[in-house]
Amino acid sequence: MSEEFRNTYITKMSENLALLRTSINLTQERLAELIGLSRFTLIAIEKKQRTMTWNTFLSLILVFRANEKSRILMETLGIYTAEFRELLIVEDQPKKTC
């Protein structure tokens, strides 16, 4: 997966983070706790003063896709797309024989 691909999704999530968070009535403090960030870091990301990491993005996906309302909102906003969901599928690879 390319850096450009990651940055596109990170940007979409960053731009809509406060909307997604409030759509499921999470405080900044609670969301930060759920994803392992400080509240101050989360606030900086919401204010676009700090860039979100890929690991933070993936943690947010896990939180928001667990709730139907925020999952649908992520789909509508182009954050949780079919293309992205395909990346989450790990298929068994055939075992190599020596």
Predicted regions and their residues:
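DNA major-groove recognition helix of helix-turn-helix/homeodomain DNA-binding modules
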Residues: 55-76
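Short basic helix-loop element that most often maps to the first helix and adjoining turn
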Residues: 15-31, 59, 92-97
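Short alpha-helical DNA-recognition segment
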Residues: 25-44
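Short, conserved catalytic or interaction motifs in soluble domains
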Residues: 47
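A short, Lys/Arg-rich alpha-helix, primarily the initiator
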Residues: 1-23
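Surface-exposed, interaction-prone regions with an acidic/low-complexity signature
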Residues: 1-4, 61, 66, 92-97
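Short, charged recognition helix plus adjacent turn
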Residues: 69-98
